Amino acid sequence: HKEYRRQRQMCIRDSVSDPQSAPKLLVGTGKEDVHLCVVLTSDRGLCGGFNSNIIKKAKNYFEKIQKEGKSLKIITVGSKGYDQLKRQYGNSIIENISFKESKNINYFDAAKVGNLIIEKFQNEEFDFCTIFFNKFKNVISQIPQAQQIIPLENENKDKDEKLESNYEFEPDEDEILSNLLPKNISTQIFKAMLENSASEQGSRMTAMDNATRNAGDLVDKLTIQYNRSRQAAITKELIEIISGAESL
């Protein structure tokens, strides 16, 4: 839920007593040179414009980053995203993750992606991380989203909120944040994967419904065409029989 996520992020930010010593996962590296983009798509097709809408959103962001002279790295989650991006951005794709064997989306899959991102961040492989997915609105409408997850996006930045804490901690602040921040990233990824999964199912249901309706319309059209051809053939045979009888 958006409000829960906002409150959780506010809680994490409020837990920081000294912005200068805050974890980099929270405040960033201070640079914007390398951007990591995590693109969530499906492993299966036949779901309408679901995948192409995410790819279009991601490509627009890629072009913007590259025009600014910044480096781009991509992690694709789902084989369809990899298939559509590998030709143009193959050199930028550093990982392709698939969950074909998973029957249902679960937190452990999200944590696997989250741990990979955190490991690469700790190895100083990127400065910013943005995740791309479809937000579920209803079965006929899914909205492509781009959400920054590293550093933690400040949703109250327009209010010029200060990053400082008035709380007392037990255990200490560093221990709490060292556990909470990685879980927060995995939770955000899990939320995006759930939104994406619901959007995929809605898009696939709509696509299959349209395909069934179109197939029904085609069958009706072909049935009418067949009956007309059959009727014309019968009429022609009757005319030939009558003409032959008259000639006798």
What are these regions (language model features)?
Residues R6-L248:
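C-terminal beta-strand-loop-alpha-helix "lid" module of Rossmann-like NAD(P)-dependent dehydrogenases
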